[in-house]
């Protein structure tokens, strides 16, 4: 068995339903994403259904600035929870680990959307915004720190598309997109836990005895590791908009799976005198004699502990089908709804080394299909003021048996509230507040992580993630 320390849950960030950023505009946040493919209240509709661009009769530019804050909590379900810290501390049943503050617990999400009518039938559009994102921040000493204590996922999408009116009631559209992928994960590397899992019972005690006798360096204390990955992909989207009456619109769109096949980056392990000495011991010390007996490949293990290593991954983001209904019920009230289908069953979490192709880590998740349902309304109490509200829900795509701390995906609900002020026919300002409330779920039950020594320690807890969105949107018409 290879003595491979370097993965330690490097792949466990957010590809599940909770990472898809449907909060493209302030109005969209306020209505919890209802009516996205049919309402066309602003130019962000290019992200959801390019066919609905035909609703625009003037040039429109939408600038959006949103702040998303993330709260991460962990509660231990057992005593002696997680591998001991350097000072011997472990979690206790019912102990609460919370981290809800700090500037690094928030994401800034800008967005730019443009719609330009070319003639009465053709409208082109452009957008630049975040399509997926997640931020998790746990306390440094929480029991699952070996499976990842911080993660940051951002996917930026550039869309260029058009909408074309085939008939007075039917429009079609398409866009092409370029997506830029960024991922950063931090974790604590616990050498003692990894050694105890790697060899037969007594391996750790044998190394401690050898260290006491001067035949080996001490097994190092915990240290930090970090993975940064970059990648890109192209994709496309097609949509249609049907307007059976002047009050009702039905929109639908489909986007195939996004395949990030060339993601590469760097894994860094913080090195100190202790880790350097242990790595040298693996390369040529007593372990070269005893290692084969214990099933440990010392030179290979030393290579796995190099402080800088190139890593790669191939990731498939889900395809997406969306259908929306918008109805202008009265001069003061609009009603809307959206159903979204996202298939995550081909999404896998796997990393390899660039240098030799060996597995860094494979984290089974058995992702499922996500179904989301959203309803919302616009209410105009005054001529220049419109109030927005919405509610939505979506199922989680991973179960209690495989869920991991930095992907605490579970069933969730969306709440939105906001208002738009239109001081003139050329300008609209929107303020919005939204909440994503994710059900707390069990973590630490996944026994299928391979290699076993990188699974992050024996921990069992409850992970809870909630997010809040504050958004400002400015629409200008020309």
Language-model regions, residue ranges each:
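Bacterial N-terminal signal peptides
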Residues: 1-9
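A subset of signal/propeptide-processing and intrinsically disordered low-complexity segments
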Residues: 7-8, 17, 44, 369
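Short N-terminal alpha-helical targeting/association segments
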Residues: 4-5, 41, 311
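Outer-membrane beta-barrel translocator/receptor signature
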Residues: 39-48, 54-138
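Outer-membrane beta-barrel porins/channels
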Residues: 15-32, 36, 85-88, 106-478
């Amino acid at each position: 068995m290879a003595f491979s320390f370097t993965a330690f849950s490097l792949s466990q960030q957010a590809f599940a339903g909770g990472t898809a950023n449907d909060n493209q505009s302030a109005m969209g946040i306020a209505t919890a994403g209802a009516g996205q493919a049919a309402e066309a209240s602003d130019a962000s509709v290019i992200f959801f259904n390019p066919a609905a661009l035909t609703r625009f009769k003037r040039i429109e530019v939408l600038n959006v600035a949103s702040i998303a804050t993330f709260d991460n909590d962990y509660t231990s379900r057992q005593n002696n929870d997680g591998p001991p810290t350097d000072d011997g501390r472990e979690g206790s049943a019912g102990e609460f680990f919370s981290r809800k503050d700090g500037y690094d617990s928030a994401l800034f999400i800008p967005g730019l959307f443009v719609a330009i009518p070319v003639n009465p039938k053709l409208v082109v559009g452009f957008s630049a915004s975040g399509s997926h994102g997640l931020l998790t921040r746990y306390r440094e000493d929480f029991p699952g720190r070996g499976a990842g204590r911080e993660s940051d996922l951002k996917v930026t999408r550039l869309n260029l598309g058009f909408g074309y009116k085939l008939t007075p009631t039917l429009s079609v559209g398409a866009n092409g997109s370029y997506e830029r992928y960024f991922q950063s994960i931090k974790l604590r590397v616990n050498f003692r836990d990894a050694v105890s899992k790697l060899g037969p019972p007594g391996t750790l005690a044998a190394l401690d005895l050898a260290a006491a006798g001067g035949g080996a360096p001490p097994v190092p204390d915990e240290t930090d590791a970090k993975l940064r990955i970059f990648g890109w992909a192209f994709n496309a989207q097609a949509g249609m908009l049907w307007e059976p009456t002047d009050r009702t619109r039905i929109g639908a769109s489909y986007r195939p799976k996004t395949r990030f096949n060339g993601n590469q980056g760097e894994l860094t392990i913080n090195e100190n005198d202790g880790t350097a000495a242990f790595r040298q011991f693996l390369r040529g010390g007593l372990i070269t004699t005893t290692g084969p007996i214990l099933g440990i490949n010392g030179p290979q293990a030393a290579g796995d502990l190099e402080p800088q290593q190139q890593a790669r991954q191939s990731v498939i983001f889900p395809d997406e089908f969306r259908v929306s209904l918008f109805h202008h019920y009265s001069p003061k009230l609009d009603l809307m709804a959206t159903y979204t289908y996202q298939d995550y069953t081909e999404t896998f979490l796997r990393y390899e080394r660039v240098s030799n192709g060996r597995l860094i880590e494979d984290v089974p998740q058995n992702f499922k299909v996500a179904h989301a349902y959203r309803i919302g309304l616009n209410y105009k109490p005054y001529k220049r003021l419109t109030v927005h509200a919405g509610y939505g829900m979506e199922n989680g795509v991973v179960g209690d048996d495989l869920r991991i701390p930095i992907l605490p995906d579970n069933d969730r609900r969306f709440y939105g509230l906001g208002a738009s002020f239109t001081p003139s026919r050329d300008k609209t300002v929107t303020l919005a507040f939204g909440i994503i409330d994710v059900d707390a779920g069990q973590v630490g039950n996944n026994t299928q992580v391979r290699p076993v020594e990188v699974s992050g320690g024996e921990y069992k807890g409850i992970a809870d993630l909630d997010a809040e969105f504050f958004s400002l949107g400015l629409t200008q018409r020309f």
